[in-house]
């Protein structure tokens, strides 16, 4: 069985010449060289070509400091790109409520296409056109907000650059917090507690108290734990299941907690909508 192959700047396998790791499965008897002067030279040139076709606004990019392309450029000591980019800059696609797509930063690695089609089975994006005109796009080149995207965010999670990012509405938040008559309410999910702890080096610790203190100082009036609302959702769903079971209602009963799952069901499997719970998600509870 072939091993999973990743992007073309990985190892290069050598038999009688150079071959890209992304398209060459390992075979018995192969001699593999991964860090020779010749390979480093070619990798550096490929990186320069990628950078020439990439938006260079790194200091204002949301991925600054976490960008895979930026990391590779530093590793290969690239401080200047020798090639010009003749392409005109495409518009930023901000039509989705969940993500923002910036084709100026796309390096056509295909990770977003793969996770959308093969992992999530949504198929909202794919490669379009060929050659120098190739790009990642929705069907008929529509905005992502008009496609069958469910807003799961997996494409943003695997994107190595800032081509797809989770939509940032913090500017709207600060604007509202500055209004004196605004009552600000925050809700913290368990996953957020873990992510914040990891980000600040508190691995394995409960930082809920620190999060509450920080939110208070920012200007929030009320802070709730999503776990409480999740308990209410479980109670409501249990009651609904018992009622359906006793009265011959539609079974099996599917949860309604995830908005992305609900949209996926609406787009792909509308016949199961009567099986979905009528309870609100914990965020809405």
Residue ranges and their predicted role:
Residues 165-285:
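Iron-sulfur cluster-binding electron-transfer modules in prokaryotic oxidoreductases
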Residues 10-11, 139-141, 237-242:
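Short low-complexity, flexible loop/linker segments enriched in glycine and/or proline
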Residues 2-9, 13:
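Single conserved hydrophobic/aromatic residue that forms the stacking wall/gate
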Residues 6, 40, 106, 110, ...:
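Conserved structured core elements
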Residues 11-14, 26, 36-38, 62, ...:
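Short glycine-rich, polar/acidic loop-and-turn segments at beta strand-coil junctions
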Residues 14-151, 157, 164-176, 183:
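Fe-S ferredoxin-like electron-transfer domains
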